[in-house]
Design a protein with these regions (language model features):
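Canonical AAA+ ATPase core
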Residues: 85-90, 111, 115, 123-215, ...
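C-terminal engagement/docking regions of AAA+ P-loop ATPases
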Residues: 234-319
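Walker B catalytic acidic pair
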Residues: 43, 106-107, 118
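Conserved AAA+ ATPase small/helical "lid" subdomain
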Residues: 195-250
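Walker A/P-loop
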Residues: 33-70
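Conserved alpha-helical scaffold flanking the Walker A/P-loop in AAA+ ATPase domains
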Residues: 28-31, 84-104
Length: 319
């Protein structure tokens, strides 16, 4: 396990060569990929969202495709289509852009709802269904989507059903002064990507994902996650609390956090460290809470503060 743990950390080091000054963002995305999750990256244009996704594909030696989501992108561009071949008298399937290990959906909230919905089965089942035939996608498979803040020209809010399928949502933010100086010194931008070297491959990632699945989680930690989720459902400031899928995402990310920390068991701090990244994009304020100046960040902090934490102790079986 230790050897693969070090490989995962080596990936974050390589990605950080192209995405300067954002080690926490890079680490959270690595956790999501280890937990078989999909990632939503939200921020204004020009802060390196696309570069981040490309750097991960390069460092992990994954096949990857990118689609710029515009209003004229069709579902068939994403999932593929069948074309009749006159010579054989049969329909032949032509794979879409998601037939890869890492699919980058760039500016996902600029396209139509119909095209966005084409991603739902892809993200949940890692498969596409075209003309009644379901085809599995290559493994490992991750959707990494970028979106501009709602309110930007030409954007629309993603539906809750799609947001819930993203394991985490991370915000890039502006680089600090030193990082921005280095970005300017290394123009054009591909000069930053050229620094990233492959340090593992898809088989390594599949092995790591299996190891993360095997990280031990006690009943006390599971109960803690359930109580956190229930607290959001019972909070009167929220119109929409956390779903059971969100609880599963918290558990998966907590296992990945423990794995990257070199532990074979989940501790309470693993849950609290990732809770906001997993839950922020899933929660919806009531109109009254919004007009009253309440924020999702405050509610998450309240939930973490008021929900009793299990005592941090190593499992008795010595794992």
């Amino acid at each position: 396990m230790q050897n693969f743990n070090e490989k995962a950390l080596a990936v974050t080091a390589e990605v950080s060569k192209a995405v300067l000054g954002k080690p926490e963002v890079v680490l959270k995305i690595m956790m999501a990929m280890l937990a078989r999750g999909h990632v939503l990256i939200e921020d204004i244009p020009g802060v390196g969202k696309t570069t981040l996704a490309q750097a991960f594909a390069r460092a992990m030696n994954l096949t990857h495709n990118r689609v710029q989501f515009t209003p004229d992108v069709l579902p068939s561009d994403i999932v593929g289509f069948s074309l009749y071949q006159k010579e054989t008298g049969k329909f032949v399937y032509h794979p879409g852009a998601v037939a890869c290990n890492l699919f980058l959906a760039d500016e996902i909230n600029r396209t139509s709802a119909r095209t966005q919905s084409a991603l739902l089965e892809v993200m949940e089942e890692s498969a596409v269904t075209v003309d009644g035939v379901t085809r599995p996608l290559p493994q490992p498979f991750t959707v990494m989507a970028t979106e501009n803040p709602v309110g930007s020209v030409g954007t629309q809010m993603l539906p809750e059903s799609q947001l819930d399928r993203f394991m985490v949502c991370v915000v890039m933010g502006y680089p600090d002064a030193e990082a921005e100086m280095e970005i300017l010194a290394r123009q054009p931008r591909h000069a930053l990507l050229d620094r990233v070297q492959p340090v593992m491959d898809k088989n390594d990632l599949l092995t790591m994902q299996q190891q993360v699945d095997e990280v031990f989680m006690s009943d006390e930690i599971r109960r803690y996650i359930v109580e956190l989720s229930r607290a959001t459902r019972q909070d009167g400031r929220l119109a929409l609390g956390l779903s059971p899928r969100a609880s599963l995402a918290v558990a998966g990310m907590a296992r990945a956090a423990a794995y990257l920390s070199g532990r074979s068991f989940v501790a309470p701090q693993d849950v609290t460290a990732i809770f906001a990244d997993v839950t922020h994009h899933r929660l919806r304020l009531t109109e009254q809470a919004r007009t009253g100046g309440e924020t999702v960040e405050n509610i998450i902090a309240d939930v973490l503060h008021t929900t009793p934490r299990p005592r941090p102790e190593k499992p008795s079986h010595g794992r």
